[in-house]
């Protein structure tokens, strides 16, 4: 009934074409469908919220022993929480659906993690998001897998960004929470893909929320410092619906929502931006806790005129206050003041018009979560395990309630931000989820819509949809040319576009249907031209197994164009005694641990083989390996061992044996995955000197009880020294 009312409202309003209308958000008055709430600013309009409670019972509705480092979301009578589960040998991320009234588990779905550098204790980093139109839930795992689930928990579609885009995950675990806006689900990830995405960097993705197809990919950054988890917010800037987000380059960026084009960028920090901005009335409020770009001072809180364009300068600041360090927490604001919490759990208040610091109060010593503002109160938890309810004013702050979760000797760490829904405050520690206050379900309502777009002007952008396709020989894809004006307003789909192909075999007809050639693999773009304006879609065509590369026919250094994660990392070179090979040179830059994928993400039942060789440089030896269905077989140079794992950072999930190998000798590696009748997988690896006959016995083996069912084949190298590959083969297992 709850969801049906929303859908009926949409139909009556004639808002099915969400693309035309821009962003339309329809929620219940008390829903909290995304990490920062229905308005994406950490603010709730609810009243009569609890000002006092106790973990021992007062105003405590329930507590369940399911914790997380991410915040839950609430939609209707369901709470959705991303949480780790399983012992260290079988850790997974799981999405749990809870009954809001009681905390009872309604359903859960588990996701095995793969090929990630994120350690187990940092899994379940990102909050899920709910689409108010359909009730579908979106989850982005620390393995960089985006999953769409129906309200009953059925998986509708998923995108594996490592296989498809060479997504890189790191030890820090930083993973962005997706947002749903109109017909799009939007997130960012660090990737190295193929074609024009041939540089390691942070990219912003818009996927069709119903199908998972790629709408656009934006690359506003020119450099990369570190990973981040700044979740985008949405605002209307002079009639342009825009995303505002902090980048891994130390800049804030504003992008056109419908096209991904950059409106402006503003450099503010010498490290990645981790928190999210605020936006009101063409003013963006930006914060960070690192060294400033133009001074050696640390930390910044600023108000910026968001109506600019291009690369903004310091002239864009309406005011700027330095010296307060909110690295992790995102700000909140009422009509007069901005509130945020620094790294040391000091909450501060700043005048919204001038930036002047009004007061500060120490809450603890460590801070990760963001505050939430509602009913004239600030709700904030600290990493020291204390949860506060505060009443701020212009002159100071009153502590209404202060509680320790757990015990003073063993406090429950609070990393997640609190949320508010249906009269309750929900607090998540690493150990438990608390529901505070009496639940008061509210009547559904339609939230204020985004301002109606201006009448479309002349065509400024041709967007080809879907933006990315992966085909087999002879397969077709129907492409559409979408026209947008200079403010990102949708005009129409253009039936008379002129279609051409570039770097691709195959052909495209006058209606935009591309047909791949009947044989061979290729990669390139299909271009649509309307007048003097063109747009492109990226297309890869990969032939069925078997594949074999000995690299002898190579005429250029670059590897095959359809390989993902290869540009700038691996090169076809000639070396003495071996002829032409594939080389991963020594590399100290971002993405030193390189994974290169060369197949479809849904492949299974195959074997990968290759000759490999290392090299000692500066008394260091790199690592080299193969990838099969999201399992890695890796020879460690310095460690002189062989490992077999689905998730390298998960030590208890890794099989390993000592293996002495010479840096100047070629070895043959072989990796095979077999799916067994009991639902488990037998993963086996073999290594032997390439000049010798293949031994009958496997060198290493692992039985995985939470197996991966599919994944692209690939190669792996840790570039602390040169490593080499030759005679690479992928074929169906017999």
Give the location of each predicted region.
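Extracellular carbohydrate-recognition regions
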Residues: 30-34, 538-566
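Noncatalytic, solvent-exposed loop/strand surfaces
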Residues: 24, 28-463, 480
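Short S/T/G/P-enriched beta-strand
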Residues: 443-486, 534-546
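Flexible glycan-contacting loops in extracellular carbohydrate-active proteins
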Residues: 694-724
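Secretory/extracellular carbohydrate-interaction modules
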Residues: 576-578, 584-652
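Extracellular glycan-recognition surfaces and repeat-rich motifs
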Residues: 54, 556-581, 589-592
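Short, aromatic/His-centered strand-loop micro-motif at the edge of beta-sheets
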Residues: 648-670
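Short tryptophan-centered beta-strand motifs in secreted/extracellular beta-sheet-rich domains
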Residues: 551, 608-610, 665-677, 683-687
């Amino acid at each position: 009934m709850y969801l049906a009312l929303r859908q009926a409202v949409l139909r009556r309003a004639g808002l099915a074409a969400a693309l035309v209308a821009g962003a339309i958000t329809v929620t219940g008055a008390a829903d909290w469908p995304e990490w920062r709430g229905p308005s994406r600013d950490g603010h709730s309009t609810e009243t009569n919220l609890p000002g006092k409670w106790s973990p021992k019972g007062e105003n405590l509705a329930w507590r369940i022993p399911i914790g997380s480092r991410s915040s839950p979301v609430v939609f209707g009578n369901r709470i959705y929480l991303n949480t780790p589960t399983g012992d260290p040998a079988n850790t997974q991320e799981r999405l749990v659906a809870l009954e809001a009234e009681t905390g009872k588990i309604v359903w859960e779905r588990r996701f095995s993690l793969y090929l990630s550098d994120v350690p187990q204790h940092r899994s379940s980093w990102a909050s899920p998001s709910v689409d108010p139109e359909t009730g579908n839930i979106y989850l982005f795992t620390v393995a960089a897998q985006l999953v769409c689930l129906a309200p009953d928990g059925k998986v509708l579609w998923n995108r594996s960004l490592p296989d498809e885009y060479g997504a890189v995950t790191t030890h820090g675990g930083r993973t962005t929470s997706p947002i749903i806006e109109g017909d799009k689900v939007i997130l960012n990830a660090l990737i190295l893909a193929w074609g024009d995405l041939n540089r390691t960097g942070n990219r912003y993705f818009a996927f069709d929320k119903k199908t998972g197809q790629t709408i656009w990919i934006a690359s506003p950054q020119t450099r990369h410092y570190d990973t981040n988890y700044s979740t985008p917010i949405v605002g209307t800037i002079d009639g342009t619906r825009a995303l505002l987000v902090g980048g891994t380059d130390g800049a804030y960026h504003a992008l056109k929502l419908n096209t991904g084009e950059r409106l402006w960028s503003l450099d503010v920090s010498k490290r990645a931006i981790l928190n999210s901005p605020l936006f009101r009335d063409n003013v963006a409020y930006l914060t960070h806790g690192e060294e400033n770009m133009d001074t050696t001072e640390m930390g910044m809180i600023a108000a910026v005129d968001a109506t600019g364009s291009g690369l903004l300068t310091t002239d864009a600041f309406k005011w700027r206050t330095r010296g307060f360090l909110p690295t992790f927490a995102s700000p909140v604001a009422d009509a007069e003041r901005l509130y945020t919490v620094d790294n040391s759990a000091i909450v501060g208040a700043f005048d919204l018009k001038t930036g002047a610091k009004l007061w500060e109060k120490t809450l603890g010593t460590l801070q990760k979560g963001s505050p939430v503002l509602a009913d004239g109160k600030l709700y904030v938890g600290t990493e020291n395990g204390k949860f506060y309810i505060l009443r701020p004013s212009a002159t100071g702050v009153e502590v209404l309630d202060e509680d320790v979760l757990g015990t003073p000797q063993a406090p429950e760490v609070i990393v997640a931000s609190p949320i508010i829904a249906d009269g309750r405050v929900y607090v998540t520690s690493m150990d438990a989820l608390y529901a505070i206050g009496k639940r008061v379900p509210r009547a559904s309502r339609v939230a204020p819509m985004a301002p109606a777009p201006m009448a479309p002007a002349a065509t400024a952008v041709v967007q080809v949809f879907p933006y990315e396709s992966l085909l087999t020989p002879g397969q077709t894809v129907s492409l559409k040319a979408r026209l947008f004006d200079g403010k990102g307003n949708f005009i129409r789909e253009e039936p008379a576009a002129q279609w051409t192909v570039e770097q691709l075999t195959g052909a495209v007809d006058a209606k935009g249907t591309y047909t791949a050639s009947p044989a061979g693999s290729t990669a390139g773009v299909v271009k649509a031209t309307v007048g003097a304006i063109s747009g492109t879609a990226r297309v890869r065509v990969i032939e069925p197994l078997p594949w074999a590369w000995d690299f002898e026919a190579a005429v250029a250094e670059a590897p095959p164009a359809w390989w993902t994660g290869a540009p700038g990392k691996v090169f076809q070179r000639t070396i003495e005694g071996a002829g032409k090979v594939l080389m991963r040179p020594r590399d100290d830059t971002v993405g030193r641990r390189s994974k290169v994928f060369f197949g479809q993400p849904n492949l299974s039942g195959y074997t990968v083989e290759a000759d490999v060789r290392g090299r000692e440089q500066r008394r260091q030896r790199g690592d080299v390996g193969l990838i099969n269905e999201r399992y890695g077989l890796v020879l460690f140079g310095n460690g002189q061992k062989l490992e077999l794992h689905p998730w390298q950072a998960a030590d208890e999930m890794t099989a390993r044996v000592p293996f002495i190998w010479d840096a100047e000798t070629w070895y043959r590696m072989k990796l095979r995955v077999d799916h067994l009748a009991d639902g488990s997988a037998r993963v086996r690896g073999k290594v032997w000197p390439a000049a010798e006959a293949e031994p009958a016995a496997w060198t290493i083996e692992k039985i995985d009880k939470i197996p991966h069912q599919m994944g692209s084949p690939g190669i792996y190298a840790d570039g602390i020294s040169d490593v080499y590959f030759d005679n690479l083969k992928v074929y169906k297992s017999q």
